[in-house]
């Protein structure tokens, strides 16, 4: 048995309506038939930009740990919808037209941590909440890091208080498994990093690897 998600355009779209649109997401309402001749059903969902997150990792001589154990760069940010300060990975929206996941990840790492990386790979791809949201999220691994000499980006609002912090990878993974880290991208990225590092980095995908992204979203609506 092959475990692989597959694209499916076989369902008949009867109607589509954009009910509301804001700067970050829109509310869409569709009517569709799951089977030919079946009664139509309605579904509402949020149309969202794609997003990226970055596991920035250092180890060996670059690590601050005595034994050279791997560390990941994390940030702590207030998230108003859940009323919580969350430990997260550097992350952001793919809201620039035509922008690749790699370019977006490079930008977010630079803007949020003043770091850049020479080596990039794809770690894991997820749909944040496929039952109600189109957001497609790619988590990338960034290594061979160096500090940006000049960063003109001004952090505002919740990002104004970002404090990038190096955390031992083992501690971060333990915190995720203990229910102390709740951000979905962070949990997925940390566990993926721990697993693939244990395999000697075998199986890492390229930064531009094929990606089963949502075909529609904030910028592109389905046509009848």
PLM features: residue spans?
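Conserved hydrophobic/aromatic beta-strand scaffold that supports enzyme active sites
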Residues: 27-31, 74, 139-141, 164-166
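Active-site-adjacent beta-strand/loop module that shapes the phosphate/pyrophosphate-binding cleft
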Residues: 31-36, 129-150
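Short loop segments at secondary-structure junctions
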Residues: 35-37, 58-62, 78, 98, ...
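Nudix hydrolase/Nudix homology domain
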Residues: 2-7, 11, 85, 122, ...
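Acidic, metal-coordinating catalytic segment for phosphate/diphosphate chemistry
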Residues: 14-61
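Conserved Nudix-box catalytic region and its N-terminal flanking loop in Nudix hydrolases
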Residues: 3, 46-48, 53-55, 65-107, ...
